[in-house]
Amino acid sequence: LTGGIPKYVELFCDNQALSVDRIYDFVFSENSLFIDEGRNLLITEFGKNYGIYFSILLEIANGHYTQGEIESVLGGISIGGHLSKLENVYNLITRERPIFAKPGTKKNVRYIIGDNFLNFWFKYIERNRSYIELQNFEDLRQLAKADYQTYSGKVLENYFKQKLAEEGGFKEIGSWWETKSSTNKERLN
């Protein structure tokens, strides 16, 4: 959730938010810094075109990982240029391909949000803005808590991929998926 940002870690520690329940109580509350933090960070960065970038990031955070899936959900608009900027200019998303796919292939490419905080913010806060506007923080907390096992599993998976990459000694580290499913991480010596 913190994305490694010391300010966020300090806020959790200072407010005794050290368990999942306490963290969610702190994050999903009326005066929480986190409610508008993602928006404040990115609107300045994206400028007047922030809407399309927010829409793309929101879809990625919610499981639409391919360009085709995202374009379909967004009504068929072409987003190739926006994906390229999110990846290469803003460094917010990463392109992944199945571990055994041929290098350079675009088939089965998926996009993920590389920053844990922004991924969390888009998945739970921005996606559920209506709960916030109605000040229905209890239901928002329950929604996020119900998804904790799945969400934390994906974060842990990415952590292990990063750690294995830092160790070195592997030809590739990644996931394998076909059109709709993904399986466990594979690593090759």
Feature names for model-found ranges:
Residues 38, 45-52:
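N-terminal positioning helix adjacent to the helix-turn-helix/winged-helix DNA-binding module
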Residues 53-61, 161:
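Hydrophobic residues on short alpha-helical segments
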Residues 1-43:
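Amphipathic alpha-helical "lid/sensor" segments that cap RecA-like P-loop NTPase cores
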Residues 3-7, 64, 86-91, 114:
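P-loop NTPase catalytic cores that bind/hydrolyze ATP
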Residues 73-94:
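Short amphipathic alpha-helical interaction segments
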Residues 24-27, 42, 46, 95-125:
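Short, cationic-aromatic polyanion-contact patches
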Residues 63-73:
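Short acidic, hydrophobic short linear motifs in intrinsically disordered regions
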Residues 107-189:
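A cross-kingdom feature that marks ATP-driven nucleic-acid transaction machinery
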